[in-house]
Amino acid sequence: MSTNPYVKFTSQQVAKPYLVFALILFVGQILFGLVMGVQYIFGDFLFPLIPFNIARMVHTNLLIVWLLFGFMGAAYYLIPEEADRELHSPKLAMFLFWVFAIAGVLTILGYLFVPYAGLAKMTGNDLWPTMGREFLEQPLVTKMGIVVVCLGFLYNVGMTVLKGRKTAINVVMMTGLIGLAVMFLFAFYNPENLTRDKFYWWYVVHLWVEGVWELIMAAMLAYVLIKITGVDREVIEKWLYVIVAMALISGILGTGHHYFWIGAPTVWLWVGSIFSTLEPLPFFAMVLFAFNMVNRRRREHPNKAASLWAMGTTVTAFLGAGVWGFLHTLAPVNYYTHGTQLTAAHGHLAFYGAYAMIVMTFISYAMPKLRNIGEAPDNKAQVLEMWGFWLMTISMIFLTLFLSAAGVVQIWLQRIPEDGAALGFMATQDQLVLFYWLRLLSGVIFLIGLVVYLLSFRQRARAELTAEVAAGHA
């Protein structure tokens, strides 16, 4: 049992460095996003120090890695409690934390300070070519390191579940985590045929974010809702199974909407369009799930900020992944919209709503306990955190709207006219500068919201110190 009265098991404390490091990487991701926002307007900004392609690579890689740290931290916190036993090996968890953190930092530094071709040569890409593909730019050694970390992580949490109590939350969480690791193995398959390459590339990208990651999100949300509402576990688990079934049925065959224009058989035009229309359903179910559970709550949990994050993530995920995804998922529409700023609008709101917000939901609930503060931080800290929530969420919604408007104009000028009348790509970009300024403004406000959110931890730190002093006098 734990010496910290607010966590059940001592080994749950290993979640803390994972969640803290996730937030540090999140800050880095936003800073590089702002660099890109300026570069869309002033193309030579920070050139040649940080070219646009490098800034984008760092921005997207930091997104992936900080979310993985968040998922791992959440797993290390909730799985021991759900399994009703200590984590199998806290020492292994801490060892893997340092391996993953050091490898991640070195990879980002490699992107920034070593020419990409030189980095590929240094890391053995000629022996097993895996680099150069969007989102999978990591050197071979980094990819292999990710596999090692995933295997060690799955062994650790898997043994905890096998030796402990099995719950729906544990089973769904483990299914999502195993799927995450298995799908990543396709990152090592890089065929010369471009159609085949793209076909399997989407196994990693789509089946992560619109497949197994949804399972992880649903398990994390269910766990937090049980804790903050006091609703019967059986009720929440029934909802969880329905959401998981919807996510898998729609998500797996929904991969087809990425196969429209890569040279795949025409059957994917139908399969992708039909099943992609079902993909908003699990996110809509999460909205109903969260609000229904909060309305049926049996207790007033003192952590109001965690409740706000829990409800906010479902609504924003439904808007970003559901509504904005559906807007351009049908093949006749996607013919004009794919690869435009409308795609970027969908990606930003979906990732923020579904995955960034669920990690921050979990941090909001778990961090006061991990820091021995109590069920919730003081009222000032919660008010500050909720200000951060609203600033980040509203600015992201406006950023999405501005990118959507840019996408519509881009389609109107570049895609719809016949070849002779259509503007070229760069000429079209010149017509979108106003929207890029508005997007940059939204990004700056988002950063302000993130800073406000992080400042709430200073308030918590004072409460933490007070708790430690009180414990010392006891």
Kindly label every feature range from the protein language model:
Residues 34-41, 47, 54-161, 186-192, ...:
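Membrane-interface helix-loop-helix modules in multi-pass inner-membrane proteins
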